[in-house]
Amino acid sequence: MNLNLYSTMRGVGARVQQAVASGLYSFATTPPEFAGGFLLESTGDAASPSGQENAPTSAMCVGEPGRIFASGYDSGEGGLSRFAEFEIPEIVAGTDMYARNLGARVQGYRNIDADFSLGSYATEEGTQTIGGMYYDPSTGRLHVGAYKYYDGDYNGQFNHYVYETASNLAGTRTGPLLVSASDDGASNRSAGFWGGQIIPLPAKWHTAFGGTHLIQNARRVAIASRASIGPDAGSITPSTIGSGGGIEKTLMRYTLANPLAAWEDSSSGSLVYLTNQLWNHLSNCAFAFVIPGTDTLCYVGHNLDKRLDSRGSNTIMYKGLNSEGAYADNDYAPYWADGHVGCYWLFDLNDLALTAADPVANPFYSHTPYEHGYIDVPVMAGNWRRNVWGGCFNHHTGQMILAVTRGAEPRFTNTVTSYEVFNLPGVTV
């Protein structure tokens, strides 16, 4: 496994890379090990005819042992507001898609636009995009975080939907709800900020953070000003959602005035996001989790591969032609066709606790990862259209599952996702 580690700086000076013994995990010293992968049943049903086909993202979470909830897509009616429950099949080593097992669908697709009677709110510009899911084993609930795909007028009203019994998605539901924060400085845009994934916290952090879990939505979305310009985190207690509970404390968020990229580049304007290694126009945090037995909050996604700088012209383009003459339609893309790479950002929960205790002295934009670098995902090699748009941590097995757009080619076309599994050496659950 080839990981490229960047040193990082924070306001108090250089951060020395820590080892597991100090309470922090290091991907540089213990790289993730590629274990193989699996696919999910790609066909749809009446609620989502396209199923896993054409799905440009895949928000997901593990439920009961051997089960996973994953979003799908239907281009005709509501886009990325669909999801279903699947079996996790036996993992097959290697990258031969024809050899991989298919996980059968065990509960049919649900459409949050329909399930929660969003009606005229779910217009084309208001289509709900699932940003994260969380199965709460203590309550049996399935939490679905979502945001409006395009919200140029910042009128998003809802971002959270609760299926009271995850094993019976057709049953009782609570919502639509707005999970927001009073201390994030952007109350009119909180729906976009917090329509994502809920993350369990170790019990020792509950008091310090004022919640039992974290919530984050650091996906790359349209209209950057309504998102965090870097990873984000707020504390929350899921059992209170639906009865007035919201974000207890904003712990990490980056604004346009204080982006994560500013920690390594003082350039002004948008040019910084063309080549910045911490955060740029390609940066995307697909999922996050606390690495068991450590104080490490890990974000995983994709980024621009700065190892290609020696070629020259290693930058990001918008609706342009890449090195192979392919047109990057309607989005940002790397100039080099193999310029996308898996990426991770590791943060110290002790730093976030400083913000929880004194947000004036330690603003939520004051954090930098103590380590970040690359995860080389074999199926992404050389293909600029493949990237990590989804994933989750399997708390039953201690493995990361990365969802790679178009990874199932050539067995399936139409952007069918592949699910790539990585072991974390030394991590036990």
Q: What is each model feature region?
A:
Residues 276-384, 391:
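Loop/turn-rich, solvent-exposed surfaces of beta-rich toroidal or solenoidal domains
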Residues 387-429:
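Blade-level signature of beta-propeller repeat domains, shared across WD40, Kelch, NHL, RCC1
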Residues 50-65, 115-143, 149-151, 185-219, ...:
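Structural signature of eukaryotic scaffold interfaces centered on beta-propeller domains
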Residues 74-79, 149-153, 304-307, 407-411:
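Short glycine/acidic-enriched loop and turn motifs that connect beta-strands
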Residues 35-77:
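Beta-strand-rich domains and repeat architectures in extracellular enzymes and scaffolds
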Residues 56, 80-135:
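Blade-loop segments of beta-propeller domains
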Residues 80-99, 154-180, 224-259, 315-353, ...:
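Beta-propeller blade signature
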Residues 1-21, 427-429:
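Enriched but not universal
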